[in-house]
Amino acid sequence: MKKEKTPPLSKNIIRLASLNIPGGGQITVEDGLAFVGHMDAPNGTSIIDVKDPSNPRILKQIFLDDELSHTHKVRVAGNIMITNVEQAQRHLLRRGEKLPDVSKQLALSLGRPPNDAEIAAALGLPENKLTDVRRFLNDGYNDGGFRVWDISDPSKPELLSYVRTHGFGVHRFDMDENYAYISTEMEGYVGNILVIYDLADPKKPIEVSRWHMPGQHIAAGEKPSWKGYKNRLHHALRIDNELWAAVWNAGFQVIDVTDIRKPKTIASHNYHPPFPEPTHTALPCEQLIDGRRIAVVVDEEHEHTPGQLHAFLWIFDVTDPKKIQALSTFNVSETESPWSQCKGRFGAHQFREKIDGTLVYVTWFSGGLRVVDIANPFLPKEVAHYIPPAPEQFPSPQ
């Protein structure tokens, strides 16, 4: 273990150990094992024994065959593990689909063929990414979906099936021992929708139903009232017979899955605009607080515009699904992290997707882990935090 040049900043949290592994997009911990979905190829998934938290031990690392995809999300139920397969650099490459038209327009306006610097500037892309864009336009992308693994022996995960979906492929998702609740693009729809798969035979997952917002199913004649794919499913989390769906710039919705074959929307709440950052996760607490059903919602920070709010945490009263009411918010000031002005994102991102008490464990990009007590839902209070130092060759912790 290396001695860090800059120590972590901490209150009421003690770090027991660390591992020098590539960054992850999701960590799932089950029965003393940590499953890490890595952000970038060739790193796929790491399975780590954390039964002794002071001495974590890597059991297995799964690597990817190419750099076209990343598998940065992972979940586990029993002896089954699911990893997503999503197009790497997806937003950048989707923007690059305009390259042929932009090149023609530039040629007409300039009176000559444009050079790469001019094309990249018109697309709003780094010039060194045009090679990737041209490869994508030539080859397309057909690998998006999810993989199902048998982890009876976590040191030797066995691939059981690979389900291909469409477009970008699969982003975040939820699962239990019966079903997978997948957020993915699908042919005929704009933006990610919910597709539910039966896992009774993990070697052959079977689609049982779909859910989307009105306006997404363009193949059926629906017309979105928004531009692009800004309104879409980020992911949905199951609690009892409900799925709590964060739908990006459309806020959050609650889906009844009492009949798994006919999911239906029973509640929705949208606070966009005026709040600029999209809704990342929504989830109710497992117990009532002062007789109220409370839900926690977090937005995800993107490129920050000065003068606008950073992404933050919301607390809602959802006792009456027809009258959802915001009770409070929790914010982290730029003054509370030495990396808030460094390159990279600062604001909120995600919380632990299980709220079994009044403590919410929520992360800020360069603002670190914040432990927030919502025992008084009108006045959330931070009780602990931990900000790791920036990794080598990175300007800030993310």
Kindly give the residue locations of the regions a language model identified.
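Short, amphipathic alpha-helical "recognition" segments used to contact nucleic acids or chromatin
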Residues: 99-111
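Feature marking well-ordered beta-strand scaffolds used for ligand recognition
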Residues: 1-101, 119-398
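Short, charged amphipathic recognition helices of the HTH superfamily
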Residues: 108-122
